[in-house]
Regions:
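Active-site-lining helix/loop region of Rossmann-like oxidoreductase modules
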Residues: 4-5, 10-153
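Conserved PLP-enzyme active-site core in the AAT-like
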Residues: 1
Length: 153
């Protein structure tokens, strides 16, 4: 049987979000906050003055599908959350440029019959690619290690 394995990338807790779907999810919201430099070269430049920001600016509110399509290098991780949760059209995403942020932050809130969960990750951006973080690469390393491991956590 063929199997497509989607790594969690910069995030953790995706297994818990996926498990929560077994009882039914009501909402999944993913807020992605990055320094303005991480949004350079994207549509965000036409939605706000990235260089002139003095306070956090939420420049996008929409579905995970829309976020990933419009900001593929920054919000592709929103699809991971969506696929683990409510799907790309029911998962809500907010994208924020924050001049005071030195990290790429992901805040995921989910509610449902299981209760609620709040997941927050603050990943140091890669020096050569501020849109991404080392956690993304480490996630892939762990996936490869798990393929040959007798104990997988």
């Amino acid at each position: 049987m063929a199997q497509l394995i989607i790594p969690p990338g910069a995030l953790g807790g995706i297994d818990a979000l996926s498990a929560a779907t077994r009882m039914g999810l009501e909402s999944v919201e993913h807020r992605i906050v990055k320094p303005p430099v991480a949004w350079a070269g994207t549509e965000a430049e036409t939605l706000c003055d990235l260089a002139g920001l003095r306070a956090p600016m939420a420049f996008f509110h929409g579905t995970a599908r829309e976020a990933a399509a419009r900001f593929p290098l920054n919000a592709n991780v929103a699809l991971v959350v969506a696929l683990a949760g409510l799907g790309p059209d029911r998962s809500r995403v907010t994208l924020v440029a924050d001049p005071a942020s030195a990290v790429n932050r992901h805040e995921i809130t989910a509610t449902g019959a299981f209760g609620s969960m709040v997941l927050r990750f603050e990943n140091a951006p890669l020096r050569d690619d501020p849109k991404s973080s080392a956690m993304t690469a480490l996630s892939l390393v762990r996936l490869i290690e798990n393929a040959g491991a007798s104990l997988v956590i």
